[in-house]
């Protein structure tokens, strides 16, 4: 009795198309004599050729063929093959630090429009402090998402990369302390209490957004908090700090400043919204009810399209009413192709987690370019 077991592994492509693809070859333990003829027999064929010279009758027992699919394993394998350098780049989130640069630069440009002053040293101090605050937001977000399980399979999570929750949290708290120290020191030098209160409000928004016991991002309030923190609070505070001098301690809060801060908050919130497209299933599993979890990706793509339209409609209205200087409006409309790119990309790929991951980076590009255009327009209007 001869036993045959065939294991087919789809991963390596060894899959028999039909029964005649499987053959049995008789094992030979001695040199064949002149009369022996060895043939290959199909396992299942009813018309199997027989050894004409062999008198004994051989019985074949065929066992089932087990075929395994490695579709899921292939995905895991692909994830494991992502270079560590690329994972570190994702963890650093360097493009995301534009959310520190844009409010500061727009605020500085608005202050220059009002006063004709640019305080370079104060600008650099505020920039470094803002970067430290964003670092705290990123690190603490990874820590608390690790605690809830939201980042369990997120390979670019800082906690997963370094393997230490405690170390990551310590780095986050250190960044927060240094960043707040820089902001307070600058505010005290400028003798501007309003700026201190606005910056404190912005940081408070960041805390209740992700830190326990609040974690308001899990209730779908992340986007409004992001809008307030980086728009009216941070942008206006930077305007006040960078326009304060020995001659002018208190700047007026004009419509140009407030409208500019609204635009900054608008595009910052869009980044946060689009960053959740590829995380819908994971967020839902841990009870994180972001707007995209509630809406679904198809309705989310619809929201992105109309958000882009609303953004440029606001620009048009602000330009026609002369709330924003004409150079600002013209410069900002040059970014319209990037806005269309964000809208079309999300609409096309919102169901593809592999591609929609890039949507937030297109939003970062729009945010940075619109901020640069807005800043340049304010400077030109001077």
From Swiss-Prot:
Chain segments annotated as transmembrane: 99-119, 123-143, 168-188, 196-216, 224-244, 257-277, 323-343, 361-381
Membrane topology: Multi-pass membrane protein
Transcription found in the keyword field: no
GO biological process: photosynthetic electron transport in photosystem II; phylloquinone biosynthetic process; plastoquinone biosynthetic process
GO molecular function: 1,4-dihydroxy-2-naphthoate polyprenyltransferase activity
Record GO cellular component, one term: chloroplast
Domain of life: Eukaryota
Signal peptide residue numbers: none
EC code(s) of this entry: 2.5.1.130
CDD domains in the cross-refs: PT_UbiA_UBIAD1
Presequence extent in this chain: 1-66
Disruption phenotype: Slower growth and dwarfism. Albino phenotype in aging leaves. Decreased number of chloroplasts, but normal lamellar structure retained. Absence of phylloquinone and 97% decrease in the content of plastoquinone.
Root EC class: transferase
Aminoacyl-tRNA synthetase as UniProt keyword: no
Catalysed conversion reaction: 2-carboxy-1,4-naphthoquinone + phytyl diphosphate + H(+) = demethylphylloquinone + CO2 + diphosphate
Keywords: Chloroplast, Membrane, Plastid, Transferase, Transit peptide, Transmembrane, Transmembrane helix
Subcellular location: Plastid, Chloroplast membrane
PANTHER family reported in the protein's UniProt record: 1,4-DIHYDROXY-2-NAPHTHOATE OCTAPRENYLTRANSFERASE, UBIA PRENYLTRANSFERASE DOMAIN-CONTAINING PROTEIN 1
Family in the record: Belongs to the MenA family. Type 2 subfamily.
Function statement: Involved in the synthesis of phylloquinone (vitamin K1). Catalyzes the transfer of a prenyl chain to 2-carboxy-1,4-naphthoquinone.
Descriptive protein name: 2-carboxy-1,4-naphthoquinone phytyltransferase, chloroplastic
Gene name of this polypeptide: ABC4
